From Swiss-Prot:
A stretch of 270 kb of the mitochondrial genome is duplicated within the centromere of chromosome 2 resulting in the duplication of the gene. The expression of the duplicated gene (At2g07693) is not demonstrated. It is found in: Mitochondrion. This is Uncharacterized mitochondrial protein AtMg01290. GO terms for cellular component: mitochondrion. Keywords: Mitochondrion. The lineage of its organism: Eukaryota, Viridiplantae, Streptophyta, Embryophyta, Tracheophyta. It comes from the Eukaryota.
Length: 111
């Protein structure tokens, strides 16, 4: 039986150590310079920006595949400031809404 170093084992997602390797190894995602966030975290407010994101496939250590990333189309994502402004515009105070309704009713009564 020959000894195989664990660094070169190609693990499958069924193996519980697979995810541990993904977290522990700084080389688990290779071949991309701009991969700060994966597709799931694009919409989080902290990382949101207008940039080209790449879909990153985890590469098992030891495999020689060089094509890891496929560039996606440019996603226009709200930047944190813009996002908050947009939300503020949409969320209106219920009391001010009631005032507007009352004013409308008053106008109709006057007419």
């Amino acid at each position: 039986m020959t000894f195989v170093p664990t660094d070169f084992l190609i693990r499958t997602p069924d193996d519980p150590a697979y995810f541990k390797d993904r977290l522990a190894s700084p080389f688990s995602f290779r071949g991309c310079s701009k991969t700060t966030s994966t597709s799931s975290s694009i919409y989080s407010k902290k990382k949101a920006s207008t940039a080209t994101y790449f879909r990153v496939d985890p590469v098992p250590r030891g495999s020689q595949s060089s094509r890891v990333c496929e560039p996606k189309t440019k996603l226009i994502v709200y930047q944190p400031g813009n996002y908050q402004k947009k939300v503020k515009r949409q969320v209106t105070d219920p009391l001010s809404l009631m005032d507007k309704v009352k004013k409308r009713i008053d106008k109709t009564e006057i007419l």
